[in-house]
């Protein structure tokens, strides 16, 4: 008989009845892969303050681990059900509290907070408790797995560090540093000095250590490596500081920074009180700034006896560095190179290419074929080929890729500085099984880049180095034989990970004839930037500075003269106000001048962009030059005004694409053959320039306008929070991961790239450069500046070209007289020091040179004249260029066209005239012949006045800002400010002057004409009785040219001609347009009267009530005279008094 049904029992059975279906249905309804389920769990366990943050790469790794764990547990559960013997029971009372079954989680020695301990009102309150517990166990297993992996890496890392050769010398280095102020650590490649010495110092208790590197990429990689080797136990105590980027904080104890940044810090604080130890790495490379830093440290050490210095070098010329620092002790560490077999394969005489021929790629292909025949593909080992330049890399690349497509055993990759960052990173990827990498590199892989897995090296024995020719004033990229030290460095790349082979494509006798060491950079480059920095740091005369190896005296003198010509140094070689500011701008002098000059006018935004664009490498990729599709897509951005304006248009268009939410800037750049990384550099430089100009008061600070409504502000905060999370995720993930390369018919790519295809913008494909760009810059402000700059008026464009022209002067080129009859590629131009230059292939004028020709209706020459030498035109143009680079030809790089006559009158350092001023010679090499002498005199007088006003306004502005900074924003800073009204008036007058239409001839003087240009010193020793052109200036005979020195740049009547000797006595009647005076004047008297006429406009363009300057006495016969009729005061000779009275009759 069944038991009676009670309420309790019935209720219990009902609960069981209702619970049973739910328990049976739960496994079917619960889905771990459901997005809503995962979102709830991430809200509970993966918050911002947790170890794993939601959306991070670590979060994605956990879910992959979780899926594998679920499959494993499901398999284990199904096997357990088949052979389950029943639950065991404890027979011992003491073990009653232990679990009945073993679970691996009991070995996990950590715990995490569960949702119960966080409160029942959190986001996970709707989750079943049993599912939360199951998820928590999975999370514990994952953390335990990660911990075991970390301990495994730690053990491996400690073994690797202990195996480094320098590990046996750590205590010796510290002891030597304790006893001496300077220590030289010399170690061969692979000894570990760059990563281990900073850690030894940190472990020894040093807390302020700076380690300099010659390149930015080395600072980043070493800082990350040191942080990794310390397992981040020092946290933020290891950081790096480079241009535009820094991870340095108040807690940083070791900072890796570039040499240039350390010199800037010395410029601000000469004693470097913030550092205890300075490590100068790679001193053997003999870079310009490294040599200068050593000289600065030699002077600083006696003043800072507590400062320690470690010089780290390869085993190259160690005695030079030791003796420079009073025979500092040397700790020499052996390298860890495996045996390297050297094979000399000199080229035959018929295989040696001449200077005009391409490199013969056959010797390099024979090496590839020899490796294929001798070594089975199962033996790993890649090939590194050292070539002299990009042209040589391209030649060998084409031949090697053809060979690789036949054998399917090679992946050929180029490596040089002009490649995009993504293409450079491919050399670190892994080749598939049975395939080797063939890396074609310049000397960048000699010391700057270390590539693992290299077993074979091919050394061409050549290198291209930049040198400066002070006579021709050009940079020359020439091919040289390398030094023995460089040859050993290249050979060492083959023995880092195992026995290697080095193929030298030259004879052993050639190696013996090599120079032992490379030529220091200080002995072959222009020194103007270095001299300017030395003047700013007040380290004394550059001629007597104690360099480790002094530069050629001629290079120092050339640099000083160049800085004086640019206005950065005065006649006593002291810094001028503009020179002080130029020394603080991290750009060439000409680019810095553009920024300073442009800050005066309302053209700050376009000048900032152009200056930044001219300060980086060309953003146009090398392959895009021959790609018709890229050229067609880029054509709307090209400007017929010149390359700076083309770069200006490219940057503005890119900013517009960036500001569009649906815009794909990477695709936009690729279609136009533009390297986006260069555009990011432009944006960073532009911001830095703007901040520097704002700091010096030359540019008003931008007002950041916040979004008006609360929703927009909230949306902006969310976007920045997401960007910060993406950046943190990238940094935690270690950046770019190595990929597996795959063979393709036209080159190579990575498997990951192929998988992404057109979906490269997915969430898991983070463009870290784009993230940093949006965090660093205000995109709305950039877009507004780009939009306004696209609508430059004609006046703004003319004024902008004027600023660029003055900034680039004296870097001018004049077109050859026969260019109109030449092909586009044969256009020839001449500079003052170099004849026969041509346009660079990337120049916009190389494809459309007709805009530089003076012909048709704009020119009126003699009938039948085809060469343009006798053309009278008001449209003659000059090319202002940023640099002159000679490779196989001398090329003009980054050119802009400017009007010839007005530019020469405003910029020339020397202007010489004949008697009636119809013939002018600028800087002793360009001749201007004007048909109308009256127009010539009028233009000359106007240019004199405008130059004086411009110089005065610029000097007052710079001097006022310098005084303001010096007196810390005091109200009375001495010199008057430059008012906006004055700047606006000066701009209007400059534009009117530039718009003047005066026909003239332009030609370059021959060498013989330049030698017989001047009349020479005259027997007349006194100046004519003429009022001065300026307030305190007086006329005096020029001691060498002859004629009369009107100003420091204008010499009147000094050019040879039949009438020049008597022209100062030849007068013609002229009526003053201001006071109506009608009398005979010489051209010089007319200029003088126009500048001192009481009825003429005041000298101050911005002051309407400015009183005229009092006349200055320039002759012994002049006496003060007050006219009763007109009420004016004059300084007149008796004859001039009679003339003045006659005009009132």
From Swiss-Prot:
Using the record's annotation, list all stretches that form the Helicase ATP-binding domain: 174-334
Where on this chain is DEAH box (motif)?
A: 281-284
Would I find RNA-binding among this entry's keywords?
A: yes
Annotated Basic and acidic residues bias: 1-14
Q: Source gene?
A: Dhx34
- Write down the CDD domains for this protein, in alphabetical order: DEXHc_DHX34, SF2_C_RHA
- Its EC number is 3.6.4.13
Residues found modified as Phosphoserine: 749-750
InterPro entries recorded = DEAD-box_helicase_OB_fold, DEAD/DEAH_box_helicase_dom, DHX34_Znf-C2H2, HA2_WH, Helicase-assoc_dom, Helicase_ATP-bd, Helicase_C-like, P-loop_NTPase
Natural source organism = Mus musculus
What binding partners and quaternary form does the record give? Forms a complex with RUVBL1 and RUVBL2. Part of a complex composed of SMG1, DHX34 and UPF1; within the complex DHX34 acts as a scaffolding protein to facilitate SMG1 phosphorylation of UPF1. Interacts with UPF1, MOV10, EIF4A3, XRN2, SMG6, SMG7, SMG9, UPF3A, UPF3B, CASC3/MLN51, XRN1, DIS3 and DCP1A; the interactions are RNA-independent. Interacts with NCBP1/CPB80; the interaction is RNA-dependent. Interacts (via C-terminus) with SMG1; the interaction is RNA-independent.
GO biological process: any one? positive regulation of phosphorylation
Q: What is the lineage of its organism?
A: Eukaryota, Metazoa, Chordata, Craniata, Vertebrata
Keywords carried by this UniProt record? ATP-binding, Helicase, Hydrolase, Nucleotide-binding, Phosphoprotein, RNA-binding
Name this protein carries in UniProt: Probable ATP-dependent RNA helicase DHX34
Q: Which domain of life is it from?
A: Eukaryota
* Pfam families xrefs: DEAD, HA2_C, HA2_N, Helicase_C, OB_NTP_bind, zf-C2H2_DHX34
> What does the entry list as the binding residues for ATP?
187-194
Which reaction is recorded as catalysed by this protein?
Answer: ATP + H2O = ADP + phosphate + H(+)
Q: Where is the Helicase C-terminal domain?
A: 370-538
